[in-house]
């Protein structure tokens, strides 16, 4: 590989590259490494250098855990010299674990997960990710382009998952206060290779993936790659819930090994799932009975129970087309242009419930849970009256131009990255009208065959959201000798969000819609508004390198989320963050830390202390002269994060992380059901680990543990439901054997102790998602 002539610069010429060389690494528990890392370094007789590891079947065994960089050109330095917490989860990690979705891969990042189960009857769908105290599900990107939609993202075409913690507004524009997630897609390369996996397991889990790459004869520097996926799997420990999907991702590249390279990537995915409405919290720890439900104390329902019907469905179609053109003007200057069009369609129906109790003045049951004999548990029924429908289409078109230049001004070296982005994002939510209903079902023995006369169709009461953005950005890293770097970034986003909501007029109560003189049942426009402004986000960091393999850093960053920035919706409510008259939510993050590569730079250790202050929050405790809430609210997340990734020895790989967070509402009303000042759905402590050892015989054994502290649910009017959840620990394991260079059999085991735990809980506390029960997957990995 030909490196740049200017020392220490980051652009690498493609002229002699035949594909990205993989360096074998892994991540270990920070506390264990602190005690043993130096000893291991001294005892390792064969230091695992990149070159050596690539000669001992690292690619065949697939144990590369460590990535040195993220894929975005906006990050001008290797991870070790980047003053920010960024975790990269490589395909070697999530493939070895048998993970198939983004949510499963993110279990390798401490404190990141799907902890929120929705509001009232609305159940969250897809990758509903929380990170460092805030919802990050609308800050998910694919190859640096926002990926819209509440869907579950498959990993069959993903090279690595990049978790950027801390404000990401300078890198991506509007985003969640505490970070963003990027999925890097697989690309065609100059080699002939075929690989894939056949998987079967408990609860009728079946999956097939294939990855085929071929050079094109007669067309020098060209290659084509096709990734395929098929899956039909029930969910372990959940009756009737099913995930069925198919995907194909062809990629073709031209001009590899030349100064000008072109890539065309396509992606098509279909999902036909039976969604999970989760389980009533009746009888579990911290549940207290409402009137008439006293007999249910200590009698939780079976966590496998399914309370939906055969009519429930989650049908998703995702289509994406990407064209990328790269040109190297020299070894020190590269121009990249990326054009993408993408569309996601979702048709969703769920027979949802709210497990309320209560009795009337005569003592008869009046809630959603009813009975004929209070002492006979088999007589209890649960109403399925909160039917949820989604009929949504999201689309995006973008053109991103980036120029990366390395140069020097006197003795100071610069790694400059600058560009412009033009983006249009649209969302259409089709109104759905329903007639009929689903019958109640047994609380302790529900039957999904009990369907009623519920029907639905589009009503015409649609809502439309669109955001157009023009972005300019510049990043520069200044190197003052070998020991000191300063990295800065500045981004300006000129955006315009337009939103129109239509509704069927009429009705009574708080959801009544004024007809304005029109006949009842007429479709009327309730909101037609827009928001337009310029966001300025920036970050500044400094790195001191006492030695080449270590970095000490400090960083400060500002990120903003404007009204409607997360969901394209605007509101005329004075208490809504989506009111276009309000200022953007602003996040300020301070971070100091250290990064150190030990064991001949094969093992990366990381320590970060961080604090994020989120301001311009709605504060109903502080009213203006008109009696309206003000934006004096403030939230804070601060803590420590430890992680490590790499090889302890040539054959011992490990990945682990630990975080301890203190979350709080600094100004404003408490938002938790138990009245504590914490933020909701955010564990204050979490640990994750995964380690494997490869024997010369071809046998690999490994496993890991993950710990998640309890969660505080949100505040609403629900009574008696759990206000918080308990902590839990889960143990997983893997055993594999390479029969030949071409075939490896792998057995994954999850939740070895069959721990029964609450993985997420909804805002009112009526429903919870049980954790995955003990599961086994047997896979055949092949490679030619």
Regions found by a protein language model. Give the residues of each.
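Acidic/polar loop-and-plug regions of large Gram-negative outer-membrane beta-barrel proteins
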Residues: 231-236, 248-255, 259-328, 344-394, ...
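Gram-negative outer-membrane beta-barrel transporters
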Residues: 611-613, 630-716, 753, 779-783
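Outer-membrane beta-barrel translocator/receptor signature
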Residues: 156-159, 170-248, 256-262, 319, ...
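C-terminal beta-signal and adjacent terminal beta-strands/loops
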Residues: 2-4, 707-716, 736-784
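Acidic, small-polar-rich N-terminal luminal/periplasmic segments of exported/outer-membrane proteins
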Residues: 3, 32, 52-191, 592
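Membrane-embedded beta-barrel scaffold of Gram-negative outer-membrane proteins
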Residues: 326-328, 334-340, 344-352, 553, ...
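Face-selective signature of the C-terminal outer-membrane beta-barrel domain
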Residues: 324-343, 383-502
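Structural signature of Gram-negative outer-membrane beta-barrels, strongest in the C-terminal barrel
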Residues: 253-255, 394, 413-417, 421-425, ...
